[in-house]
Curated annotation (Swiss-Prot):
Name of the gene this protein is made from: porB
Listed GO biological process terms: monoatomic ion transmembrane transport
Record-given protein name: Major outer membrane protein P.IB
Cited function: Serves as a slightly cation selective porin.
Cellular component GO terms held in the UniProt record: cell outer membrane; pore complex
UniProtKB keywords: Cell outer membrane, Ion transport, Membrane, Porin, Signal, Transmembrane, Transmembrane beta strand, Transport
Subcellular location, record wording: Cell outer membrane
Major location category of this protein: membrane
Record text on subunit structure and interactions: Homotrimer.
UniProt cross-references to Pfam families, sorted A to Z: Porin_1
Cross-referenced SUPFAM superfamilies: Porins (SSF56935)
Topology of this chain in the membrane: Multi-pass membrane protein
Natural source organism: Neisseria meningitidis serogroup A / serotype 4A (strain DSM 15465 / Z2491)
Length: 329
């Protein structure tokens, strides 16, 4: 019996040496409640309330690499949503890819985070409700079926370029070009992400040319995180010669005290949108909350949010609160 076990172990050693596969994931759920009031002409025209048990973005994934020699490695990842509320389906519906990595950097093909999405730490909240995260400025972020190259880091500076065909769904179903850079020096950092698209449809509005730019700067170490972001979108409509633009700003501050990390975010949108430069869609949003770490993998979450769109007699005001639990593996 012992000889059989030894033989089996020895036979498995070459497989273990060649394979480097990691199973990972996050399970997170909570209870959220919200109330929204819409005003038109100074009158309340609708009131909506709701409370529910929600999934906060659970996921499961597999990733690995193979050493091809001479410093070159094959890399791959398959990641999918894993809602404990049973509302997500499909396979590889999060970031999933295959590629090569070496001294030249990293080249990947698949369903990949856009360069803009990789600057998304400005919105660190685990939430389902749009009122419990600075989600309006984060709305253009996406995962795209694309090819992407990430350079190695030189003196704290690295860059990325990405190309997507019109193989994506919804508002991202258009040919697009993406670029960005990251600079780190100690705890200080600067990030830029941008994209250019042609012939895009957003909410049934036909756009001939569209571009977006986001610049994020801040400081991040083991205890303190602080960042400020500015984002501008610009669009030329098919049936309109004018360029419509929208500018948004956001800031996030967090500090870790032992096992507790309180956090606050603020976002503001200025007048104007990509479909109408004169549209008054000004908004203000505040989210406050905290995390308590029971361990390195398990944390309790609590947050509260407030959002106001418009002002005066015509406005939309929403408040929300949530508690949750998150476990990483």
């Amino acid at each position: 019996m012992k000889k059989s076990l030894i033989a089996l172990t020895l036979a498995a050693l070459p497989v273990a040496a060649m394979a480097d596969v990691t199973l990972y994931g996050t399970i997170k759920t909570g209870v959220e409640t919200s109330r929204s009031v819409e005003h038109n002409g100074g009158q309340v025209v609708s009131v909506e309330t709701g409370t529910g048990i929600v999934d906060l973005g659970s996921k499961i994934g597999f990733k690995g690499q193979e050493d091809l020699g001479n410093g070159l490695k094959a890399i791959w990842q398959v990641e999918q949503k894993a809602s404990i509320a049973g509302t997500d389906s499909g396979w590889g519906n999060r970031q999933s890819f295959i590629g090569l990595k070496g001294g030249f950097g990293k080249l990947r093909v698949g369903r990949l985070n856009s360069v803009l999405k990789d600057t998304g730490d400005i919105n660190p909240w685990d939430s389902k409700s749009d009122y419990l995260g600075v989600n309006k400025i984060a709305e253009p972020e996406a995962r795209l079926i694309s090819v992407r190259y990430d350079s190695p880091e030189f003196a704290g500076l690295s860059g990325s370029v990405q190309y997507a065909l019109n193989d994506n769904v919804g508002r991202h179903n258009s040919e697009s070009y993406h670029a960005g850079f990251n600079y780190k020096n100690g705890g200080f950092f600067v990030q830029y992400g941008g994209a250019y698209k042609r012939h895009q449809d957003v909410d049934d509005v036909k756009i001939e040319k569209y571009q977006i730019h986001r610049l994020v700067s801040g400081y991040d170490n083991d205890a303190l995180y602080a960042s400020v972001a500015v984002q501008q979108q610009d669009a030329k409509l098919v049936e309109d010669n004018s360029h419509n633009s929208q500018t948004e700003v956001a800031a996030t501050l967090a500090y870790r005290f032992g096992n507790v990390t309180p956090r606050v975010s603020y976002a503001h949108g200025f007048k104007g949108s990509v479909d109408d430069a004169k549209r008054d869609n000004t908004y203000d949003q505040v989210v406050v909350g905290a995390e308590y770490d029971f361990s390195k993998r398990t944390s309790a979450l609590v947050s509260a949010g407030w959002l106001q769109e418009g002002k005066g007699e015509n406005k939309f005001v929403a408040t929300a609160g949530g508690v949750g639990l998150r476990h990483k593996f």
